[in-house]
Amino acid sequence: MPGAVEGPRWKQAEDIRDIYDFRDVLGTGAFSEVILAEDKRTQKLVAIKCIAKKALEGKEGSMENEIAVLHKIKHPNIVALDDIYESGGHLYLIMQLVSGGELFDRIVEKGFYTERDASRLIFQVLDAVKYLHDLGIVHRDLKPENLLYYSLDEDSKIMISDFGLSKMEDPGSVLSTACGTPGYVAPEVLAQKPYSKAVDCWSIGVIAYILLCGYPPFYDENDAKLFEQILKAEYEFDSPYWDDISDSAKDFIRHLMEKDPEKRFTCEQALQHPWIAGDTALDKNIHQSVSEQIKKNFAKSKWKQAFNATAVVRHMRKLQLGTSQEGQGQTASHGELLTPTAGGPAAGCCCRDCCVEPGSELPPAPPPSSRAMD
């Protein structure tokens, strides 16, 4: 981390609803919620992360430093922290609001999708994560549902959400960070070894794998066997799903999904790989195969995530704000930072009367042998 950062002293508000009109609950976690809201002064739509202060007891000092660092993050592919309020028993983090929806939805809706499209997506993720790493920030939970489109425009950029405040968690609780999405976690995290920025590079490799075939590289109904696969870095480029994918793409993934974190590519090295920086990413249309597998393996009925990007798209289309210009305060949304809970609104949440089904962990996909194409 950078050295101790001054500030920012959050603003005091007697009632946050005097400033913001709460519209909808976008996500819920153990001690927090993400709310879609409108600034009553500017009519700007934002995402407000409401954090129960009791969840931060004993961590106030580190919290101030972490939020100060978040406040300084300015990158075109990372959601921004605009403001902070304290009111009653909660902190309110005012975040940008993304309006473009989820990564998988966009891919499925496209009629044409290529390796080059996937390469452009991964380039944006690598560039943003390199920026975080240069600041000493490790995301630790990169996954497709944390990649959201900035706007409804066809050429919209991708945005990384849901990062940074994980640093406020007990650094010894490595497994608690991974349990919600085991398929994306680096081997050293599962082995409960000290880990570094390299864990993010592994996760980017997993995301690249999924973007090129539509299913995750690791699967087993039994968590222990799933973890064993990850610990050994056992994955395949299965036929026929990878037959039309370039050797360069596979080489890129192998360098990121390298078991040894010391040998694993850094973001800087990955950005220099020919599949990203060169012209080796193919232009062949792989939409049918990839979209079919995404629909099978990441179906909405099975995948209930903590952040509801669909609700944002619905609101944006209703208000005809989905294509706001970047320079005019177009907003992007921050996903859920804390581990989701089951069974109702978040404990200690700021809107207990809101009826929202909390997110649950991403289910594993069927093994390659049972993924016969229709």
Curated annotation (Swiss-Prot):
Residues 276-316 are annotated as: Autoinhibitory domain. It is found in: Cytoplasm; Nucleus. Its main location: cytoplasm. GO terms for cellular component: cytoplasm; cytosol; glutamatergic synapse; nucleus; postsynaptic density. Widely expressed. Keywords: Allosteric enzyme, ATP-binding, Calmodulin-binding, Cell cycle, Cytoplasm, Developmental protein, Differentiation, Isopeptide bond, Kinase, Neurogenesis, Nucleotide-binding, Nucleus, Phosphoprotein, Serine/threonine-protein kinase, Transferase, Ubl conjugation. Dendrite development is blocked in hippocampal neurons silencing CAKM1. Belongs to the protein kinase superfamily. CAMK Ser/Thr protein kinase family. CaMK subfamily. This is Calcium/calmodulin-dependent protein kinase type 1. It comes from Rattus norvegicus. The gene is Camk1.
